């Protein structure tokens, strides 16, 4: 996986930026607020078609403009791809996506073309904020490579919204609510099966990574505890919980209530871990995602690393450098130009530096 070119127009504070990449390691250097993370964000859209920072895509548009556009050329598994993505500022947020000139009517059909892993400071919330954030992380990770899962998830969420609307409806009959139960059960089962297999694999990578990061001092585990374990149990719970669900106005069982404990002996890292332990767990988890994609596809995903190296101690930096040496291509943002050589100066791979100032980009030099 290798990104060769990117062109962005009216994206955040970038009016028009065009870059060509020839190196495995690319650094975006600049003070806070100058637009370096915006560049990383534009690259992440090639994978996720949405920001890793912002839920409202209208915020991606440059101030006082009506649309934004991204064009990129990348190579994957020996094939060349031309990616074109436009977002129009409106209540409906009209989007148009083309790959090699072919328009995608459904965004979910694009999944898996450009694979990347984002590492950024807010990732610590995966540990600190518990199961809602962890389910969001897991869904995003699986959906980034599995189109079938994404379609199942989209349909499940649509069905839950429909059932919840019926639950809130005054004098809704049990039959009116129950018509949603069977399709919900079917989609829930598919999602649960894929989540189970994913966590079984991801957990192994995570545990080994964390042992290596902590020199064996933090033997924590990632586990998956589904809210429902079978179709039969799900059907019975929907019946048993109907009165309660009517009272609270939403569906109280299903995969949207799954838990993903990280810790040991029923103790979760969110409650007892130090900041260093939590940071190590995040790095171990994101590295596990990288390793799992690399091993299942045979090709390393692109790493997008947003200003986190300076937060790491010596041990974690060494681990990070080893990870970088395994990747196909990595993009970094940092304010610390002087520290780059200290982190990756010994790696015998090509490197490029770009200086970002008020949304303007210029080539600095090779390290």
Swiss-Prot record:
GO terms for molecular function: ATP binding; single-stranded DNA binding. InterPro entries: DNA-binding_RecF, DNA-binding_RecF_CS, P-loop_NTPase, RecF/RecN/SMC_N, RecF_2. Transmembrane segments: none annotated. The keyword ATP-binding applies. NCBIfam families: recf. The RecF protein is involved in DNA metabolism; it is required for DNA replication and normal SOS inducibility. RecF binds preferentially to single-stranded, linear DNA. It also seems to bind ATP. This is DNA replication and repair protein RecF. It comes from Leptospira biflexa serovar Patoc (strain Patoc 1 / ATCC 23582 / Paris). The lineage of its organism: Bacteria, Pseudomonadati, Spirochaetota, Spirochaetia, Leptospirales.
């Amino acid at each position: 996986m290798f990104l060769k070119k990117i062109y962005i127009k009216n994206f955040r504070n970038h009016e028009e930026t065009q870059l060509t990449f020839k190196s495995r390691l690319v650094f975006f250097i600049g003070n806070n607020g100058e637009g370096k993370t915006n560049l990383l964000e534009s690259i992440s859209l090639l994978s996720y078609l949405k920001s890793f920072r912002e839920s409202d895509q209208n915020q991606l548009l440059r101030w006082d403009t009506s649309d934004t556009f991204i064009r990129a050329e990348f190579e994957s598994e020996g094939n060349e791809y031309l990616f074109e993505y436009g977002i129009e500022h409106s209540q409906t947020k009209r989007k148009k996506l083309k790959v090699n000139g072919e328009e995608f009517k459904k965004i979910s059909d694009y999944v898996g073309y450009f694979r990347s892993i984002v590492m950024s400071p807010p990732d610590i919330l995966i540990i600190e904020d518990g199961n809602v954030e962890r389910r969001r992380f897991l869904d995003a990770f699986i959906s980034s490579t599995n189109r079938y899962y994404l379609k199942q998830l989209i349909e499940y969420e649509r069905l839950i919204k429909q059932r919840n609307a019926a639950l809130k409806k005054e004098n809704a009959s049990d039959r009116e609510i129950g018509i949603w139960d069977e399709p919900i059960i079917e989609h829930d089962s598919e999602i649960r099966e894929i989540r189970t297999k994913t966590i079984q694999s991801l957990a192994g990578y995570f545990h080994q990574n964390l042992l290596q990061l902590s020199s064996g001092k933090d033997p924590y585990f990632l586990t998956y505890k589904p809210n429902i374990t079978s179709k039969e149990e799900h059907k019975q719970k929907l019946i048993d919980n109907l009165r309660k669900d009517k009272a609270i106005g939403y569906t109280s069982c299903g995969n949207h209530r799954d838990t993903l404990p990280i810790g040991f002996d029923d103790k979760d890292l969110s409650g007892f871990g130090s900041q260093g332990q939590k940071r190590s767990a995040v790095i171990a988890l994101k590295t596990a995602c990288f390793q799992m994609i690399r091993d299942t596809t045979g090709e390393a995903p692109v790493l997008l690393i947003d200003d986190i190296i300076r937060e790491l101690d010596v041990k974690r930096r060494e681990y990070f450098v080893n990870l970088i040496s395994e990747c196909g291509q990595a993009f970094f943002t940092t304010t610390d130009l002087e520290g780059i050589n200290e982190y990756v100066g010994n790696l015998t791979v090509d490197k490029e530096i770009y200086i970002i100032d008020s949304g303007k980009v210029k080539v600095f030099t090779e390290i």
